[in-house]
């Protein structure tokens, strides 16, 4: 990574902006460097935001961002390996809670995270889906490749497939071999069926009670009735249905604890029989058996190449970097702090946060870092340390944004004008569409 790549990235994202492009770019630089900001208007205190605090809100209200072009810039400037190598993609969603925003449109009930044990709660808000480039080693940070809000009329799996189709096509064109890593709710038949059209391998975590089926047996001569559509049952939590695995690997993890990996091939889900997958069981003898550190984990592998059993366990843990990225975006880059009134403004703010996140990752090799007295010096800087050192680099780079042009004072509202109260919008509850069985009627 060099200064030219960072300059190319900055000019590339500036070219993706339409209206209010200068204010949007100033917002990215302010977000990347103003470590003292704890609220959205405080970003205007940054010397790299050359406008007043009201321009922050006006940029998100009037701004335009070309999402397709922004995705291309992200892929073009991402720290990708050489052609022919594997590249790991993480797909996941994160929630922006808006419980009191009655005037905000298209809010859905989303589950709340980090609750006490056995506690379940839902809160109105918006769901945003991310596709990120996962680092090959822990602690290096993720690189955002695409963001999209999940509307009330769509499912997160459908949005994720649409994102992955666009991102994977760009990566394959560069000669790379993507591997998609996802959590349990993506290991469903609709997602796997749609993903069969994507030129990528897939490693998804599976719930322990998930049921698969083996291929249907060959029809015997003279057999009566319809042929079986599914073979024997395979339930992850029932060892009696497993049988002998097709492949077994045994080794140790980074801490020296014993790890066993078993693989059963040629399985499928009942509602997606044409999608053949391999079911993988990982037994980590060094785990404590808790929900956060399970002893036994289940995964699904889909791809043209056989599952690399020796790499499955470390590869599956790469997705945790995406959760750390969400935490950084919310706690440091103020992603969930602004109380924006429309979904469109929230989508623009999400794209601005993604630009700032990626800019910090690209700038990390160019900076020595800014350490606090109690911080231990590390070989790899955290993105927070990079953010504190960014002002020096931004002064060296300059900005493609034009300086502000004061327009004087606005005339204000006309005398006697009274704005109407904003419309209230209900919270939308997503439910599964199941046909109710009709009641049988008897004729007299």
Model-found features: residue ranges?
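Long, low-complexity C-terminal extensions of enzymes
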Residues: 369, 376-444
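Electropositive, glycine- and tryptophan-enriched low-complexity nucleic-acid-binding patches
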Residues: 54-58, 113-177, 276-307
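Short, conserved catalytic/metal-binding motifs centered on acidic residues
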Residues: 43, 85-99, 131, 179-187, ...
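Basic, amphipathic alpha-helical segments enriched in Lys/Arg and hydrophobic/aromatic residues
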Residues: 337-393
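Short amphipathic alpha-helical "interface-anchor" segments enriched in bulky aromatics
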Residues: 95, 309-340
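An internal, acidic/charged active-site-proximal segment
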Residues: 149-281, 371-381
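Active-site-proximal, Lys/Arg-enriched surface segment
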Residues: 59-139
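Gly/serine-rich nucleotide phosphate-binding loop at the start of the catalytic core
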Residues: 1-74
């Amino acid at each position: 990574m060099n200064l030219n790549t960072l300059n190319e990235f900055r000019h590339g994202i500036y070219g993706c902006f339409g209206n209010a492009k200068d204010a949007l770019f100033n917002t990215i630089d302010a977000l990347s460097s103003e470590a003292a900001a704890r609220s959205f208007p405080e970003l205007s205190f940054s010397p790299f935001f050359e406008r007043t605090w009201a321009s922050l809100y006006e940029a998100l209200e009037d701004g335009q961002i070309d999402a397709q072009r922004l995705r291309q810039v992200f892929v073009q400037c991402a720290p990708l390996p050489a052609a022919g190598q594997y590249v790991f993609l993480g797909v996941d969603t994160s929630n922006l809670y808006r419980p009191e925003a009655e005037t905000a449109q298209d809010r859905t009930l989303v589950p709340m995270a980090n609750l006490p044990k056995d506690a379940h709660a839902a809160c109105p808000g918006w769901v945003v889906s991310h596709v990120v480039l996962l680092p090959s080693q822990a602690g290096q940070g993720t690189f955002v490749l695409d963001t999209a809000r999940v509307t009330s009329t769509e499912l997160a799996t459908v949005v994720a497939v649409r994102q992955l189709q666009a991102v994977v096509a760009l990566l394959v064109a560069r000669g790379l071999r993507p591997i998609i890593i996802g959590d349990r709710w993506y290991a469903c038949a609709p997602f796997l069926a749609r993903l069969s059209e994507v030129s990528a391998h897939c490693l998804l975590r599976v719930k322990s009670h998930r049921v698969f089926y083996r291929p249907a047996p060959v029809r015997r001569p003279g057999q009566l009735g319809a042929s079986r559509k599914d073979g024997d049952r395979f339930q992850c939590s029932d060892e009696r249905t497993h049988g002998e695995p097709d492949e077994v690997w045994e080794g140790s993890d980074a801490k020296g604890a014993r790890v066993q990996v078993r693989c059963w091939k040629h399985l499928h889900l009942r509602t997606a029989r044409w999608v053949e997958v391999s079911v993988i069981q990982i037994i980590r003898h060094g785990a404590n058996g808790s929900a956060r550190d399970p002893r036994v984990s289940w995964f699904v592998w889909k791809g043209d190449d056989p599952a690399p059993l020796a790499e499955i366990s470390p590869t599956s843990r790469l997705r945790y970097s995406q959760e750390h990225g969400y935490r950084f975006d919310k706690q440091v880059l103020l992603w969930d702090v602004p109380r924006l009134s429309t979904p469109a403004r929230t989508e623009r703010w999400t794209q601005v946060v993604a630009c700032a996140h990626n800019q910090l990752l690209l700038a990390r090799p160019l900076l020595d870092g800014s350490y606090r007295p109690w911080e231990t010096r590390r070989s790899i800087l955290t993105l927070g340390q990079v953010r504190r050192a960014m002002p020096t680099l931004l002064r060296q780079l300059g900005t493609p944004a034009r300086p502000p042009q004061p327009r004087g004072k606005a005339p204000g509202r006309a005398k006697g004008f009274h704005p109407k109260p904003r419309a209230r919008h209900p919270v939308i509850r997503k439910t599964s569409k199941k046909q109710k069985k009709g009641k049988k009627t008897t004729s007299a």
